[in-house]
Amino acid sequence: DAHVLEAVKVAKERNIADAILVGDKEQIEEIAKSIDMDLSTYEIIDVKDMTEAARKAVSLVSEGVADMYMKGAIDTKGFLKSVLDKEVGLRTGKPLSHVCVFDVEGVDQLLFLSDVAFIPYPTLEDKVSIINNTVEICHAVGIPNPKVAPLAAVEVVNPKMPVTVEAAELTKMNEEGKITGCIVDGPLSLDLAICPEAAQHKPGASERKIVGDADILLFPDIHAGNLVYKAMVHTAKIVNGNLLTGTKAPVVLTSRSDSVEVKVNSLALGAVVADFMKKNN
């Protein structure tokens, strides 16, 4: 994949990360030539079959030869199959989830969005896992006690809106010490979660733990998350970085349509998380 190779090239030039390239060597060389990439300083492992290439690549990470795993030209289904491989994959026993990190102009803090790409309809248990996975990423980038906003259309609990009930339950679990390393406050609407000015006009805002300063936006389902994500990327043109979380090592899972800059950001995020995991595991 040309965008992936170009991202790898830029990441190396910026001293973010080096790479071991696994795949059809002839194709890699052909693509590298088209983007003026010098391969003389890269290790290339020649594997013609894409499925076997993915399996080989993920084994390098699970064996500790490499620090993170990045999706190349293989389709997402094949890539995830290698991540979940029982022999050489990166399973930990924890549920996997996807996190996107945005640096939004006008918002003082980084925003961590989850899950926008992996879990379609998260249960309460899934949401606990998503929070735990995303909190670990926050800790890795230097946010010791991130604020988590379980999002809904309203800020009050309404039995007819199960999302609000689950958000309140997550808040209670945090208060009882069942969810740690963060502050959970929900249900919250998006404006109350990330916009201090809007939050000040909401009834009861002064009693909330989050008033426009949420770090983690926990979406009720993949539809809400994906729509917000794509609006931010394609309308507001906000660049981000993405990781699959809950694995033994960082997994860079980006879309083929993502720009080189998004892929470089994802590698940078993965490098920071990999270093954190090494120091804390």
Where do the protein language model's features map onto the residues?
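Anion-binding alpha/beta catalytic cores of soluble intermediary-metabolism enzymes, centered on
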Residues: D1-I210, D215-N281
